Structures are given as structure tokens and as C-alpha cells.
């Protein structure tokens, strides 16, 4: 978590930096004492929360989230998405999500761009993309999302 603070020279001494790390861990719903652990000692959900704390450490305006929930089980995924929403309200940070998991769109996205082979093929409000997709690729992506009512 301290790496970004150190590389950007945020001007914190060791004690201030450790306090900031503790605060960030608590903000992402982890215990302060986890700051002394090695990465292999964390679960997938804990690792994702540490990654969020690392991003917040440098007080960004924008956080790029590349497949933030792809390796998480459904219950942990929901917790992480809820945490991201809380942090967005609290810190005023914006997110750019890169994901194949279209099921996260309703909970987080305001504006959506759909890319196919590196080019944006459709963009619009999250509601428009989800309810009235125009491009065949967007339609295919949405059709691939598992839904209970299709059974």
C-alpha cells in the first residue's frame, strides 16, 4: 500500500505513512494488523481490497479497474462492488471498468462503452445499453449473461 505514496513522494514520514495505511485498510473493511502480512497470506477478496486501498493511497480522481471481480466468488464479488460504491460516494473517485462481466453494469456504471477487437462499437448510458442494445456484439454479450428467468 505504501509503494504509491513513496514513489509519488507524498511527504509522509514513516509514522504518518503507517497510520495512513491502517486507515486505508479499515476503509476497505480489513484489519490494520493485516498490513504486516505477505500477499500469499490473503484470500482473493482480501487481495482485491488491498488493491483498492493501494489505489486510494494516492488520492486519485480516477481508478482503472481491470476485471476487478473476475476471480471472486459471487458473495465476495457483491461485497467488493458494494465497497466500491461506498468509496465512490465517500472519496468522489471515478472508476473506469474493463470487464467481460456485464452483470456488474447495473450496480456501478453510469456510461458504458462496448469494445470489440479494440474498437468501441457502441456507447451510451448504462440503462440504454442494457435495455436497448443496438450493436449485434452488444446484444450477443448481453445474451451470454446467465439469468435465472431463462431456465
Cite the ranges covered by each PLM segment.
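Conserved catalytic motifs of ABC-family nucleotide-binding domains
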Residues: 59
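Short, glycine/charged-rich "phosphate-handling" switch motifs in NTP-dependent
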Residues: 111, 123
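Conserved ABC ATPase signature
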Residues: 38-42, 46
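Conserved ABC ATPase "signature" region
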Residues: 6-9, 15-33, 142-143
Amino acid at each position: 500500500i505504501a509503494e504509491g505514496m513513496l514513489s509519488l513522494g507524498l511527504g509522509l514520514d514513516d509514522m504518518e505513512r503507517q497510520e495512513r495505511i491502517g486507515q486505508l485498510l479499515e476503509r476497505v473493511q480489513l484489519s490494520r494488523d493485516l498490513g504486516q502480512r505477505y500477499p500469499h497470506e490473503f484470500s482473493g477478496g482480501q487481495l482485491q481490497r488491498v488493491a483498492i486501498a493501494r489505489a486510494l493511497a494516492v488520492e486519485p480522481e480516477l481508478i482503472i479497474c481491470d476485471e476487478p471481480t473476475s476471480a471472486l466468488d459471487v458473495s465476495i464479488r457483491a461485497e467488493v462492488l458494494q465497497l466500491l460504491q461506498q468509496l465512490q460516494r465517500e472519496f468522489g473517485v471515478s472508476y473506469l471498468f474493463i470487464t467481460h462481466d456485464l452483470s456488474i453494469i447495473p450496480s456501478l456504471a453510469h456510461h458504458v462503452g462496448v469494445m470489440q477487437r479494440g474498437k468501441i462499437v457502441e456507447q451510451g448510458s448504462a440503462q440504454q445499453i442494457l435495455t436497448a442494445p443496438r450493436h449485434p456484439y452488444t446484444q450477443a454479450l448481453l445474451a451470454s449473461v446467465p439469468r435465472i428467468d431463462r431456465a
